[in-house]
Amino acid sequence: MGGKWSKSS
């Protein structure tokens, strides 16, 4: 959880 989830959140 980091770049990928940051964009989604």
Swiss-Prot record:
The virion-associated Nef proteins are cleaved by the viral protease to release the soluble C-terminal core protein. Nef is probably cleaved concomitantly with viral structural proteins on maturation of virus particles. It comes from the Viruses. One of its GO terms (cellular component) is extracellular region. It is found in: Host cell membrane; Host cytoplasm, Host perinuclear region; Virion; Secreted. A lipid is attached at residue 2 (N-myristoyl glycine). Keywords: AIDS, Apoptosis, Early protein, Host cell membrane, Host cytoplasm, Host membrane, Host-virus interaction, Lipoprotein, Membrane, Myristate, Phosphoprotein, Secreted, Viral immunoevasion, Virion, Virulence. Belongs to the lentivirus primate group Nef protein family. Homodimer. Interacts with Nef associated p21-activated kinase (PAK2); this interaction activates PAK2. Associates with the Nef-MHC-I-AP1 complex; this complex is required for MHC-I internalization. Interacts (via C-terminus) with host PI3-kinase (via C-terminus). Interacts with host PACS1; this interaction seems to be weak. Interacts with host PACS2. Interacts with host LCK and MAPK3; these interactions inhibit the kinase activity of the latter. Interacts with host ATP6V1H; this interaction may play a role in CD4 endocytosis. This is Protein Nef. It comes from Human immunodeficiency virus type 1 group M subtype D (isolate Z84) (HIV-1). The gene is nef.
